[in-house]
Amino acid sequence: MNAPKFRPLKFGVTRVTLRDGVPGTHYLTAEQPLQPFAERMTDRLQHWAKTKPEHSFMARRVKQADGTSGDWQHITYAQAWQTARNIAQGLIDRGLNAERPVVILSENSLEHALMGLGCMLAGVPFVPTSPPYSLVSVDYDKLKHVLKTVTPGMVF
């Protein structure tokens, strides 16, 4: 059996200084200077959508009717970028903002990820919420608390 191949991983910060603040508070400061980075998480998606548009960004196994795993469904960088832009515009058109965020009440999926990316592009906060809060709960107290706390403009 062949062992999987791994490439070396460079960690950015390897040394920190610790400073105590008020009781129970600690501050960590990196000793190495911060290297150049993308300002927004979506900047990297945009970069790869232009650089490697047809390369796979995310994938999932399609579940067959009998419960077995079928073929892989791939989303390319270009598809993800365009879909995220479309979602972002839809959120803006609907007036969503920091006071009216999106609650994502769905399982981990490609659609969940794309909705999150669209929210990031639009500058709209999103709150991933555990599906059992609505599917398994009898009293829905946890779901009610989430919805009362964030006052969503949309539930996905």
Identify the residue ranges that each predicted region occupies.
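Short polybasic/polar patches that bind polyanions
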Residues: 50, 92, 120, 148
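Conserved AMP-binding/adenylate-forming core of the ANL superfamily
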Residues: 33, 54-115, 133-144
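Short acidic/polar active-site loop segments enriched in Thr and Asp
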Residues: 97-100, 125, 153
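Short hydrophobic alpha-helices that are characteristic scaffold elements of the AMP-binding
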Residues: 117-128, 149
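A short N-terminal helical cap/helix-turn-helix that marks the beginning
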Residues: 2-19, 36-63, 82-84
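Conserved ATP-dependent adenylate/AMP-binding module captured primarily in the ANL superfamily
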Residues: 128, 132-156
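Short, contiguous pre-domain boundary segments
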Residues: 20-31
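Phosphate/oxyanion-binding loops and surfaces in catalytic or ligand/nucleic-acid-binding neighborhoods
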Residues: 51, 122, 153
